[in-house]
UniProtKB/Swiss-Prot annotation:
EC number: 3.4.22.56
Organism of provenance: Bos taurus
Record protein name field: Caspase-3
Residues found modified as S-nitrosocysteine: C163
SMART domains documented for this protein: CASc
Propiece span(s): 1-9, 10-28
Subunit structure and binding partners: Heterotetramer that consists of two anti-parallel arranged heterodimers, each one formed by a 17 kDa (p17) and a 12 kDa (p12) subunit. Interacts with BIRC6/bruce.
């Protein structure tokens, strides 16, 4: 269990103090080419990390201590997976929207996928720029199939480390037992997205000032261990278990002490994803 004091990524709460191989999988691997994403384009793709740590005074939002640890951990993890990582720090709402718009207009035709990581304060459906709220759906909409054609049919992953409300999870004791053909297909514009949230809807998301957020720590660890052999949803299930079992908040404020967290994955992916 973590035993250093933890914070939550909510705007309303002050701080309480080996080589990775990639490519399309052959039939010899037991993975059908028709059921898994083509990942042997010349480039794996972009990984955009928006790391919002310091917020305008008039927002009343606290500094997100520990987020730089998350950003560095993510950078190392996705660079090892051969992604082109771009970190953007302390962006306003307008800057976040402009960044997403500009990136969506790039030519992704030689890229296998796209990843965006959002590290900030949040509420349900909302991520915060340094000066206020941005609708998460608006940020992601730039990469819909009808807007970003060069990513159509390719996996688009959004990883969100932020609160989704103000509920606290006290936990409960439990027994210990038991070349593709997309040109001739019509697909939904919202297809091939995955949203990996650090917490369930309505709940706080925890972050440690020294080690970073629980979710990002677990995500990076599981990717480093399993990205070369497990499908993405299997990896994320292991992330869920690690966060749920191994982490518990420690706070001098009894209202925030001994709390739990469970990540939440929402997938519109249409194929299996192997890095």
């Amino acid at each position: 269990m973590e035993n250093t004091e933890n914070s939550v990524d909510s705007k309303s709460i002050k701080t309480s103090e080996t080589k990775i191989l990639h490519g399309s999988k052959s039939m010899d691997s037991g993975i059908s080419l028709e059921e898994s994403y083509k990942m042997d384009y010349p480039e794996m793709g972009l990984c955009i990390i928006i790391n919002n740590k310091n917020f305008h005074e008039n927002t009343g939002m606290a500094c997100r201590s520990g987020t730089d640890v998350d950003a560095a951990n993510l950078r190392e993890t996705f660079m090892n997976l051969k992604y082109e990582v771009r970190i953007k720090n302390d962006l306003t709402c307008k800057e976040m929207l402009e960044l997403m718009s500009n990136v969506s207009k790039e030519d992704h035709s030689k890229r296998s996928s796209f990843i965006c990581v959002l590290l900030s304060h949040g509420e349900e459906g909302i991520i915060f720029g340094t000066n206020g709220p941005v609708n998460l759906k608006k940020l992601a909409s730039f990469f819909r199939g009808d807007y970003c054609r060069s990513l159509t049919g390719k996996p688009k992953l959004f990883i969100i480390q932020a609160c989704r409300g103000t509920e606290l999870d006290c936990g409960i004791e439990t027994d210990s037992g038991a070349e593709d053909d997309m040109a001739c297909q019509k697909i939904p514009v919202e297809a091939d997205f995955l949203y990996a949230y650090s917490t369930a809807p309505g709940y706080f998301s925890w972050r440690n000032a020294k080690n970073g957020s629980w979710f990002i720590q677990a995500l990076c660890e599981m990717l480093k261990k399993h990205a070369h052999r497990l499908e993405l949803m299997h990896i994320l299930t292991r992330v869920n278990r690690k966060v749920a079992i191994e982490y518990e908040s420690f706070s001098t404020d009894s209202a925030f002490h001994a709390k739990k967290q469970i990540p939440c994955i929402m997938s519109m992916l249409t194929k299996e994803l192997y890095f």
